[in-house]
UniProtKB/Swiss-Prot annotation:
Residues 75-264 are annotated as: N-terminal alpha-helix. Required for assembly or stability of RuBisCO. Acts at a postchaperonin step to fold and/or assemble the large subunit (rbcL) into RuBisCO. RAF1 brackets an rbcL dimer (rbcL(2)), leading to rbcL(8)-RAF1(4) complex formation. In the next step, RBCS displaces RAF1, thus resulting in holoenzyme formation. PANTHER family: RUBISCO ACCUMULATION FACTOR 1, RUBISCO ACCUMULATION FACTOR 1.2, CHLOROPLASTIC. Residues 1-61 form a transit peptide. Disulfide bonds: none annotated. Pfam families: Raf1_HTH, Raf1_N, RuBisCo_chap_C. The gene is RAF1.2. Residues 262-288 form a coiled coil. Homodimer. This is Rubisco accumulation factor 1.2, chloroplastic. It comes from the Eukaryota. Has 3 domains, the N-terminal alpha-helical domain, an extended flexible linker and the C-terminal beta-sheet domain. The N-terminal alpha-helical domain stabilizes RbcL dimers and RbcL dimer-dimer interactions, facilitating RbcL(8) formation. The C-terminal beta-sheet domain probably dimerizes Raf1. The 2 C-terminal beta-sheet domains are swapped and pack against each other to form the dimer interface. It is found in: Plastid, Chloroplast. Its main location: plastid.
Length: 449
């Protein structure tokens, strides 16, 4: 046991001369010395940890900094012992592959030779010297990042120009670009465009079509470059089409190809919709009345018209041979034709038919889908034509003309565009056969009068 004594004087003891009140119980004027006793045990003494103790035999200190080791020389082993004259001899005779003698140029620079001097001694221009040095460096970076000797060996002959063009790309981009160059057999101009396209692609965010091309595919980057250039030309134009075809030729992703095909050939669905609308507009502009004959309509008609009938597949000859004039005379209105004919049809005297006079003829078609310019109903038709009005005059009128397999109807504007001046006759009426399940007997709401 340890005993500690200390005299403790109170800092609060104050003199009575200052006029301050002093408590005689808690603050004695002259305090007596006070003895403080306590016991220090072994548990209170901190133990020294072995972890904090210095070992008797400390381990050897590790070397934190490795000594400087200069990079290996880029000069091939067989050329390292050459002097300047030997290096110049190798360069002048091109006595190795281009990437093997390219480091000799840098070595000569170190020896004090200037590019013009080397050009004079070796015949390698200053521009070519730079291309060889940079191309060799690009080749080394690709060689260190891949394990495909077939790819890098493809640049053994004449590869300096191609590799020089992709010098500004990252190592990963260089590998992808080099692979694309070999696969597509791209020349130096194409390699230059490829490198420029890869570097420029991120800056084109927001441009038309940007999202349809894949930045990770070098072919898509080059394709997008050509696509942007195509938009600088008029649409349509040969220059624009040529650039789009060039872009389609190098595109890799399906999304990019679809975009370019749409630009070249249009959207198929949009084209179908456009064609449908065009056909609807043509139907609205047609000035031919189309009627469906009703059962018993001829019998109930107060007046009728009799017309000779020709089959469409019989062609032009039968149309010309058909009787031109049919006369009904006498008290009983006996019909008399100028010559005999096999087939006749009786129709109500509708205004378009009654206005024909002479020269009328009815041509029978087996399938309306091959005749009408709109969707047919797969049924036969009778087309009434006026052979007297055979001159093509009305742009919006329809005329009976000769086709490959017989006869057909064609619009006047189309005939004029082909400089066709005459036809077999102008169409005045199209008649559908009677049918019980069709109450809409008049399919065209034209005012015949």
């Amino acid at each position: 046991m340890f005993s500690l004594k200390s005299l403790i004087s109170s800092p609060f003891t104050q003199s009575t001369t200052h006029g301050l009140f002093t408590n005689p119980i808690t603050r004695p004027v002259n305090p007596l010395p006070r003895t403080v006793s306590f016991t220090v045990t072994a548990s209170m003494i901190p133990k020294r940890s072995s972890a904090n103790m210095i070992p008797k035999n400390p381990p050897a200190r590790q070397q934190l900094y490795q000594p400087f080791r200069p990079p290996s020389s880029p000069i091939p082993t067989q050329f390292r012992s050459l002097d300047s004259a030997g290096k110049i001899e190798i360069l002048a005779g091109r006595m190795a592959l281009w990437f093997e003698y390219a480091p000799l140029i840098s070595s000569l620079y170190t020896d004090g030779f200037t590019p013009p001097t080397i050009e004079e001694l070796t015949g390698i221009s200053s521009i070519e010297q730079n291309r060889l040095i940079v191309g060799a460096q690009v080749r080394d970076s690709i060689l260190q990042s891949i394990h495909e000797p077939e790819l890098i060996s493809a640049f053994d002959t004449g590869g300096a120009e191609l590799l020089y063009e992709i010098r500004l790309l990252s190592t990963t981009q260089r590998v992808a670009a080099a692979t694309f160059i070999i696969d597509r057999n791209i020349d130096s101009k194409g390699a230059q465009d490829l490198a420029r396209a890869i570097k420029d692609y991120p800056n084109r965010r927001g441009d038309v079509g940007w999202l349809d091309f894949d930045y990770n595919l070098p072919g898509d980057c080059l394709s997008f470059l050509y696509y942007r250039q195509s938009r600088e030309n008029k649409n349509p134009s040969d220059q624009r089409t040529s650039m789009l075809l060039q872009a389609l030729g190098v595109a890799e992703s399906e999304k990019a190809k679809n975009r370019l095909n749409t630009e070249l050939y249009g959207d198929k669905e949009a084209e179908k919709e456009k064609e449908k609308k065009k056909k609807e507009e043509e139907v609205k502009a047609i000035r031919i009345p189309v009627v469906r004959l009703k059962f018993g309509e001829v019998a109930e008609a107060t007046s009728v018209v009799v017309l000779p009938v020709c089959k469409a597949e019989e062609g032009e000859k039968k149309i010309l041979e058909a009787p031109m004039e049919i006369i009904a005379g006498g008290d009983f209105k006996v019909v008399e034709a100028e010559k005999g004919w096999k087939r006749w049809v009786v129709l109500p005297s509708w205004n378009p038919v009654a206005a024909i006079g002479k020269g009328g003829v009815a041509v029978s078609f087996r399938d309306d889908r091959k005749v009408l310019p709109w969707d047919g109903k797969e049924e036969p038709l009778l087309v009434v034509a006026d052979r007297v009005r055979n001159v093509v005059e009305a742009d919006d009128g329809y005329y009976l003309v000769v086709a490959e397999n017989g006869l057909k109807l064609e619009k006047g504007s189309d005939l004029k565009a082909r400089e066709v001046k005459e036809s077999l006759g102008m169409v005045v009426l199209v008649v559908r056969p009677p049918r019980e399940d069709d109450d809409d007997w008049q399919t065209s709401h034209q005012n015949w009068d």
